[in-house]
């Protein structure tokens, strides 16, 4: 934020070596667990100090236009992302935070159906948005053909059926990369997370530290791209493209927003791409990640948008991510 303030108005750095502690652009993921961070109380003081200074700056500047509000909105969007990352971390470490997982556990899910999509055109509304990320300026290919798509993400019951039909032992269903991933991660798949008893009661094991009974229509989550792809091959279907997913949201039957959803699209650069001031947000991850759409139960409500382009590497199953399937009609 200091980059948009006058030199004599810059917010003073609270920690002398803050970048060495918190700069995600320069700290490798593998090193983040070993950094000697300040004590919790000191972190809280740091947050309160920074927030108070930013609020004063907003009151002084009184930003009104989209350009004037850009860095404030970027900071808020980034905070929304990290709030969800905190919840993901809590799940991994086995404790509850904000009780936000109760929302999805208490939701009644319905059996998924199929809906046919014939629309080809998507309104180009991105230029009118108050805020957008640099990767959201892409103009998607509009040459879609009619297709059939699930109205809901694949359920735990459907995915367990895939497992029962030798889905995890049939090498022909998996890509070469996916099969190698499976061999290395046999104890870290959806089948290790979700089990069932003789009465076919489905259980999420040690989810936020506790075992939870879930309905058969509960969305399968913590699914890697490789598992989703193998399931689609088993069903003789495929994952939707990003555009197909977005077009389907126009249908009232289309349910989304409880789990992120894998798409068939690689997160790529494009001819008109220009990085925004937060240069490391998109550019370093092109060609190495998969586009993920929607939101999860842990996402802040104000962050929900069909335009948002999330992205993860294919092996990631620590995320609250599931998928749905598509069938070509022509």
Task: Give the role of each language-model region.
Residues 13-29, 118, 173-210, 283-295:
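Core domains of carbohydrate- and sulfate-ester-processing enzymes
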Residues 137, 164-186, 255-330:
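Surface-exposed recognition segments
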Residues 1-30, 60-108, 147, 153-156, ...:
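Short, contiguous alpha-helical
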Residues 106, 112-113, 139, 220, ...:
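Short Gly/Pro-enriched turn/cap motifs at secondary-structure boundaries
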Residues 38, 126-144, 304-314:
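Short, polar loop/linker segments at the starts of domains and inter-domain junctions
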Residues 27-40, 64, 213:
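Acidic/His metal-coordination segments adjacent to aromatic residues that form catalytic metal sites
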Residues 38-51, 136-166, 193-252:
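Short aromatic-cysteine micro-motif
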Residues 103-117, 123-124:
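Extracytoplasmic and endomembrane cell-envelope/extracellular-matrix remodeling and assembly machinery
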